[in-house]
């Protein structure tokens, strides 16, 4: 929503690919003993067009920048598995644009940008299924009214080691956020499969 004007956008994975203007994601993890640190960043720029009545259309644009960093510690270890708890911060920067127009001319245009910082807590479970295959699951929650009203996410990831320093990743990720302040509204989630490549520094 922008300045009290709301538009509902629902897109499948194929829809996102067709309306995506730009995107990028980067993750860094560091481990030392029972402690670990991670940084995760994502940028996504989407736009879409819909029709609200005969001859009247809406153009919706959403640009999302999300950065998060957290520190965790192992609280339980087994022979080939471990359970971590972590705490950190998730930074959001969202720009919403809404244009109401006819086929030939714009009628109204609304634009707003909002940034905030959410506290974050979560758990991370990882296990080695074979010498080359491992599985990781992460669940986190945050906001709690200090930034957004609420945000939570989850990820499940399989990693296949192809060399001493490299591996291929395939998994599923979900992220939800509910934020509202001074007419700026964001009540949305994104989810889907991902494929990635991991390179270890040493």
Which positions does each model-derived feature cover?
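Transmembrane beta-barrel strands of outer-membrane/channel proteins
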Residues: 30, 39-43, 85-91, 125, ...
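Short glycine/proline- and aromatic-enriched beta-strand/turn motifs that initiate or cap beta-hairpins
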Residues: 1-44, 194-196, 200-202
């Amino acid at each position: 929503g922008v300045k009290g004007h709301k538009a509902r956008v629902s897109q499948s994975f194929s829809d996102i690919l067709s309306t995506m203007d730009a995107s990028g994601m980067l993750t860094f993890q560091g481990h030392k003993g029972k402690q670990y640190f991670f940084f995760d960043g994502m940028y996504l720029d989407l736009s879409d067009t819909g029709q609200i009545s005969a001859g009247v259309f809406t153009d919706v644009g959403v640009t999302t920048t999300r950065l998060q960093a957290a520190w965790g510690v192992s609280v339980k270890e087994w022979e080939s598995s471990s359970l971590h708890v972590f705490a950190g911060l998730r930074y959001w920067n969202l720009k919403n644009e809404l244009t109401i127009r006819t086929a030939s001319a714009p009628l109204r245009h609304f634009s707003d940008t909002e940034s905030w910082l959410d506290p974050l807590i979560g758990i991370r479970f990882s296990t080695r299924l074979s010498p080359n295959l491992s599985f990781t699951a992460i669940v986190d929650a945050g906001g709690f009214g200090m930034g957004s009203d609420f945000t939570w996410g989850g990820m499940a990831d399989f990693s296949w080691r192809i060399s001493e320093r490299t591996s291929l990743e395939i998994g599923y990720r979900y992220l939800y956020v509910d934020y509202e302040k001074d007419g700026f509204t964001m009540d949305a989630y994104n989810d889907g499969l991902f494929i990635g490549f991991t390179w270890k520094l040493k």
